[in-house]
Amino acid sequence: MRTKSPWIRGLSYHMKIYDISRDLLKALPYPGDEPPRLRAVHKMKDGESYNLSRLETSMHAGTHVDAPLHFIANGKDIASMPLTHFVGDCVVLTVPKTPLDAMYFMKRPFAPRILLHGEGQLTESAIGYLYNQGCVLIGTNKQSIGSYSDELSVHVALLGYGVAVLENLELRNVPDGRYTLYAAPLKISGAEGAPCRAILVSDEEES
């Protein structure tokens, strides 16, 4: 019987991996945005020697990261953001459909990267508190960290502090708790955001 190498066996045995990314082509586009399109340019089934596709997409389709440039004129582009924002200790919190203020987060576990599962809206006091605690990334299962009626204020507050915004996550099968997050965006110079493949890793043994 073939056995896995110790390296591969170690990865699967000691860690549980959650894919928290939505499929880029299947995720519901933000209202007003064109859906992504994947077009075959060369096809082996047509007798060519290889397959090659062309992708046309908004930088904010599917699971993606917002850089400061998205809402701040002279803010950093996605390629200039520190990779340390996207890798490291993380906590997943299920939140109620109410305004989330500083007091709410004072009573919850903290990590430099926080993923919010639910419809709650961040308040100015919460954003200031989390930044002062050392938060570098806020994520959400929603299409946007803001609300449809007020996209500007939450984005400007977070991105003004240099906090990365990770949106459109798939968190339905992820229990609340502590994880290691890996969510580096594509490196695209001059872009105000980019898609990413986000995963969470826990020390729980995978069954």
Regions found by a protein language model. Give the residues of each.
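Active-/binding-site microenvironments in catalytic and ligand-binding cores
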Residues: 5-207
